[in-house]
Amino acid sequence: MGKNNYENAKYWAMLVSVFLMISKVMGFFRDVLTARSFGAGHESDAYFTAMSGIIIVIGALGAGLQTTLVPIFSDIKKNHGREGKNKYFSTILSVTLLVMTIITVLMFALAGPFARILAIGYEGEMHDLIVFLIRQGLPIGIFLGITYVSNAYLQSDEVYGPHALMGIPYNLIFITYLLAAKKPTVIGLMNVTMLASASQFLIQLPALRSRKLRFKFELNFRDEYLKRTLILVVPIIISSTVSQINIMIDKTLASTLTEGAISALNYANKVNTLVVSVFVVAITTVVFPKLTNAVLKRDVKETGALFSSSVNLVQLVTIPAAIGLIVLNRPIISILFQRGAFDEKATILTSGALLFYAPGLIGQSLRMCFENMFYSYQQTKIPMYTGFLTVILNVIFNFILIKPMGHRGLALATSLSMLITSIIMYFIIRKMVKFNEKETIITFLKILLSGILMGVATHFMWKAFTPLMTSRMKEVLFLFVTIFIAIVIYLLATMLFGIKDTRTLLATVKRKFGRKNA
């Protein structure tokens, strides 16, 4: 049963990845259009600074709630059935709306001082624009809160479709505006962001209604599950937003550097986190509820198998992705963004940041897996402490590296802090969970060697193709050819080294789709 469960998790992770990939392709098109319209200048810096402030303060609460509520909802359903679960949904959503409203009012009043913290290098009109955009975008937090609570409810039922699909209308709204507007503005872009955020909840409504869910505003602060949620959510908020806090620190320091440094870090981070937001989120989204249920059943064997499988899958994707981004950082940024207001200078700035963000992709992805393991056991303080450590390390590395390396040093600092704390989390988990550690380490080394072979081959391939790139179209073509061949080389190498997860994943997908076609 355990084997079928984690193989089934691989299949659903793959299926969710397909939908997420469609969404992320649209998201990249959205980013390309944004870069074309605004480039890497003051306006885009103001928008990205305002958005990072909104997400880090208000979005953090929503993200923390989602992670906290999946095991809570599962426990309520187990002990009190569907009716109890639906009743608690109304309670927690009511509290969320109240808290989000209070935070929104406070942020509106304190937007000025907050903007100075976010961008210490900006004064005058630039500062005023950031303040205006923060105030304008505050309703986004309320929409995110509703979305995250609803998403947690559905994920606890192992319903993943709405989560995978919600990015499609979100990106479609952006794309429509950026294509239809004669001259897009950052104020218009913030309005579109609010509308797009609301669409993420609306796409969940059919699935929620099918479970006879009816919302009733109810503030029951004596609810035992609410008390447990409030105790658990604070450390989770801190630990789950470490990446965003680090990025905010990077952007704050980047505001003291050259114009466009903030936008360069933002675009580079978007490219870097594509793998996280598509494949790793898909894996953790599917595995987390299964881990939670396995822990609740005290099934030690299945818990270890699910954990080991998810770690191996994450490594299988992120290690070659990180190596590929390191080798091809310049052509990827050039082809994705260099057009319109996004000139060659912006490409150089952004590709430099991507080069040093890429290694942190591995640490960030593994950290997500490890956090889910702790959350399944409702051990929320450990991720919080390692979160604090990540921020402290990032600040230390920032001040060491910013002078010799500029904005690239900020990116490298983020990567180093993520890698170090993910290693620390691994050593803590190995004392908690019984899993085949030897096999996991051997798999890691095999994947790393496969990735290095792929990286070396990719470097020489691109070097050989460069003289043939006499036009933009040929550059795009050769990049796709290079990436395709690199993937083939990597998969062959993993199969040659006998990495079971490659064969298992392919066999599971083939078997599942084969049944549907039969």
Task: Give the residues covered by each predicted segment.
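Interhelical loop/hinge segments that connect adjacent transmembrane helices in multipass membrane
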Residues: 1-9, 205-243, 301, 431-448
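N-terminal membrane topogenesis motif
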Residues: 1-29, 50, 91, 220-236, ...
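Helix-loop junctions and terminal segments of transmembrane helices
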Residues: 63-79, 281-299, 304-311, 370-371
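Alpha-helical transmembrane segments of multi-pass membrane proteins
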Residues: 123-149, 176, 342-370
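Membrane-interface helix-loop junctions in multi-pass transport and translocation proteins
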Residues: 161, 168-202, 206, 381, ...
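Membrane-proximal transmembrane or re-entrant/amphipathic helices at the cytosolic face
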Residues: 460-518
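Short membrane-interface helical motifs at transmembrane helix boundaries
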Residues: 103-124, 323-343, 460-464
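Transmembrane helical elements of multi-pass membrane transporters/channels
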Residues: 12-35, 196, 200, 204-208, ...
